[in-house]
């Protein structure tokens, strides 16, 4: 005879990170059964075809059951574990687990296709993602050789309170390979026209690496379009840069050549997956991409130095500024964070590299939410 299923049971399910995620692999549990869990505590590691990340507790409670085990490959929304108070019996949990049915990932590919949109800006086809429906917009700008998926762990956590938009810059991702220019000012101007085309009057602008330089330049050149600025390992706060990365990224033609270059981005080189490398190589082999990246690299990092310093002009912008760095950044030295403008919030994650928005996603998201809320 089945027991009554308690309404106090809280499921832990496979999250959906990014627009195209369909399944994840359980790597390891980070807590034991019987542990008292607080909201947001990382409780298990999951790997996708992009990168690994920690699943956070959706609520507070006691971890009563680990349903998924290390090595399990499960679809989005599959049951991973159960939180429940002590008064819930093991039999009730057994019945809950047995009765749980993984919900359909509603539109799946159709949903992802709807979330990806395209705009024509100056004759350049630009792919972008838009989620949420908040009154204020948060615009994400990726770095050299990246794309909007560099923010796959950061968009959904903000979409409940904001409209979030991330674009592929010209010459990147699925946007046209034709560049809008090779200076930060030219790219910032292009982003402003992208905002015009997509109906964004003003936005909180979040930029990573080269995209951080673009965000800073936009705040300097068009302050009326920028509500606040958040920068992750940005260019523009000093002239040092590892040009071996940019040159190596452009020249790599095989997985063997690309792997050691991409590993420079992360404190944990094990995060670089075969799928990640294959996706990058597929992008690099598109007509016009190598030429675009070569021109961009020479324009911004020619001679092995950063050519522009908009970050040092942010102090006069009057904008609220967040600067985030990885202490193990091998591309742009974390010491550049010391050049952040007076009054800026500065955070250095000691155990992260150049991609702290991915490596320290949960901590980064909490920091960004606080920054956006003022």
Curated annotation (Swiss-Prot):
Inducing stimuli: By growth on acetoin.
UniProt record, GO biological process: acetoin catabolic process
One Pfam short name: Biotin_lipoyl
Domain called AB hydrolase-1: residue spans: 137-360
Cofactor info, note text: Binds 1 lipoyl cofactor covalently.
Enzyme Commission number(s) from the entry: 2.3.1.12
InterPro entries per the UniProt record, alphabetical: 2-oxoA_DH_lipoyl-BS, AB_hydrolase_1, AB_hydrolase_fold, Biotin_lipoyl, Single_hybrid_motif
Domain of life: Bacteria
Gene Ontology MF terms in the entry: dihydrolipoyllysine-residue acetyltransferase activity
Pathway where it operates: Ketone degradation; acetoin degradation
Disulfide bonding pattern of the chain: none
Domain Lipoyl-binding as annotated: residue spans: 9-84
Cofactor(s) needed: (R)-lipoate
This protein's UniProt keywords: Acetoin catabolism, Acyltransferase, Lipoyl, Transferase
EC top class named in words: transferase
Catalysed conversion reaction: N(6)-[(R)-dihydrolipoyl]-L-lysyl-[protein] + acetyl-CoA = N(6)-[(R)-S(8)-acetyldihydrolipoyl]-L-lysyl-[protein] + CoA
Positions of modified residues (N6-lipoyllysine): 50
CDD domains per UniProt: lipoyl_domain (cd06849)
Annotated SUPFAM superfamilies: alpha/beta-Hydrolases, Single hybrid motif
Keyword Ligase: no
NCBIfam families per UniProt: PRK14875.1
Function recorded in the entry: Dihydrolipoamide acetyltransferase involved in acetoin catabolism.
Protein's recorded name: Dihydrolipoyllysine-residue acetyltransferase component of acetoin cleaving system
Phylogenetic placement of the source organism: Bacteria, Pseudomonadati, Pseudomonadota, Betaproteobacteria, Burkholderiales
């Amino acid at each position: 005879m089945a027991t009554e299923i308690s309404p106090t049971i809280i499921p832990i399910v496979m999250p959906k990170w990014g627009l195209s995620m369909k399944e994840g692999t359980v790597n390891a549990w980070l807590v034991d059964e019987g542990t008292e869990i607080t909201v947001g505590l990382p409780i298990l590691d999951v790997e996708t075809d992009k990168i690994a990340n920690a699943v956070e507790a959706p609520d507070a409670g006691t971890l009563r059951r680990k349903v998924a085990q290390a090595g399990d490959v499960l679809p989005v929304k599959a049951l991973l574990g159960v939180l429940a108070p002590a008064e819930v019996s093991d039999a009730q949990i057994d019945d809950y687990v047995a009765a749980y049915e993984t919900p359909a990932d509603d539109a799946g590919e159709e949903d992802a296709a709807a979330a990806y949109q395209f705009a024509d800006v100056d004759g350049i086809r630009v792919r972008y993602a838009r989620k949420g429906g908040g009154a204020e917009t948060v615009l994400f700008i990726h770095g050299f050789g990246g794309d909007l998926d560099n923010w796959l762990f950061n968009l959904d956590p903000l979409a409940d309170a904001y409209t979030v938009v991330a674009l592929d810059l010209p010459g990147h991702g699925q946007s046209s390979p034709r560049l809008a220019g090779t200076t930060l000012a030219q790219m910032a101007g292009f982003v402003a026209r992208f905002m015009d085309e997509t109906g964004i009057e003003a936005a909180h602008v979040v930029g990573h690496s080269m995209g951080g330089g673009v965000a800073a330049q936009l705040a300097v050149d068009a302050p009326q379009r920028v509500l606040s600025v958040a920068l992750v390992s940005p260019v523009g706060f000093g002239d040092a840069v590892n040009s071996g990365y940019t040159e190596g990224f452009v020249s790599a033609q095989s997985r063997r050549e690309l792997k050691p270059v991409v590993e420079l981005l992360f404190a944990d080189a094990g995060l670089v997956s075969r799928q990640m490398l294959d996706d990058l190589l597929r992008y690099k082999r598109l007509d016009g991409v190598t030429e675009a990246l070569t021109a961009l690299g020479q324009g911004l990092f020619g001679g092995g130095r950063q050519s522009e310093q908009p970050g040092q002009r942010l102090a006069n912008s009057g904008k609220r500024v967040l600067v985030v760095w990885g202490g193990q950044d091998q591309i742009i030295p974390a010491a550049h964070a010391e050049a952040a403008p007076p009054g800026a919030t500065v955070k250095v994650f000691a155990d992260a590299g150049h991609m702290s928005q991915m490596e320290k996603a949960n901590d980064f998201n909490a920091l960004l939410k606080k920054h956006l809320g003022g």
